[in-house]
Swiss-Prot record:
Pfam families: RadC, UPF0758_N
GO molecular function: metal ion binding; metallopeptidase activity
Binding positions for Zn(2+) per the UniProt entry: H173, H175, D186
Position of sequence motif JAMM motif: 173-186
Family: Belongs to the UPF0758 family.
Taxonomic lineage of the native organism: Bacteria, Bacillati, Bacillota, Bacilli, Lactobacillales
Residue ranges occupied by any MPN domain in the UniProt entry: 102-224
Protein name (record): UPF0758 protein Sez_1052
GO terms for biological process, alphabetical: proteolysis
Keyword set, alphabetical order: Hydrolase, Metal-binding, Metalloprotease, Protease, Zinc
Length: 225
């Protein structure tokens, strides 16, 4: 059996070349990303230490840059590389879920966006632009900020709608608290964006609030649509 204590000659990179990435352990894959260890730990020992600080592999996403840097052997550069890897993995997953089929329901959009935004610790507002066949032209992040800051203005959303020559759009934002119940500001914003779309001849199909575990659709549950 492969052992980091007895076999440093056959390193993870060589094992990946010889056996393929699917044969490597989480420890070995992480060691490839970390590249080097430090004076106290070999890179495989460092990756094992990092993984031992997690309840599950998914918890790695929850570490901020600062929290990663506080772990022994993980400096600023390694922390940045880990965060970049996690973000890229998220984007690859999202891109893989994109289909050419038309958007048929709010639930379909909500399921996708729960995966994309559910774990975000800041509020993200995303506009999804569709053509006349309800196929997605572009998904655009309009706003990233804290819950204390006001949400994006409709003009920012409409600018990209015109740029994409969209027929309709869906607005989605997350609640970092995990609660999807809309606030008074959410209602006000929904009214504003719907009026603005009506004025320009665009169709606002829905405004959806998501968290990791659920969603709220203004089209499904309010009288605004």
């Amino acid at each position: 059996m492969y052992s980091i204590k007895t076999d440093h000659k056959l390193m993870p990179r060589e094992r990946l070349i010889r056996l393929g990435p699917e044969k490597l352990s989480n420890q070995e894959l992480l060691a490839i990303l970390l590249r080097t260890g430090n004076k106290e730990k070999h890179v495989l020992e460092l990756s094992a230490y990092l993984l031992s600080s997690l309840d599950s592999l998914a918890d790695l996403k929850k570490f901020s840059l600062q929290e990663l840097q506080r772990l022994s052997g993980i400096g600023k550069v390694k922390a940045i590389e880990i965060k970049a890897m996690l973000e890229l993995a998220d984007r690859i997953q999202i891109a893989g879920q994109a289909v050419a089929a038309p958007v048929l329901s709010s639930a379909q959009v909500a399921e996708k966006m729960m995966i994309e935004l559910g774990d975000k610790q800041q509020e993200h507002l995303v506009a999804i632009y569709l053509d006349s066949q309800n196929k997605i032209i572009e998904e655009k992040t309009i706003f990233i900020g804290t819950v204390r800051k006001s949400i994006a203005e409709p003009r920012e959303i409409l600018y990209y709608a015109c740029k994409n020559m969209a027929t309709s759009l869906i607005v989605v934002h997350n609640h970092p608290s995990g609660l999807t119940k809309p606030s008074a500001n959410d209602y006000h914003f929904t009214e504003k964006i719907k009026r603005s779309c009506d004025y320009l001849g665009l169709i606002c199909l829905d405004h959806i609030i998501v968290s990791k575990h659920g969603y709220y659709s203004f089209r499904e549950k309010s009288d605004l649509f």
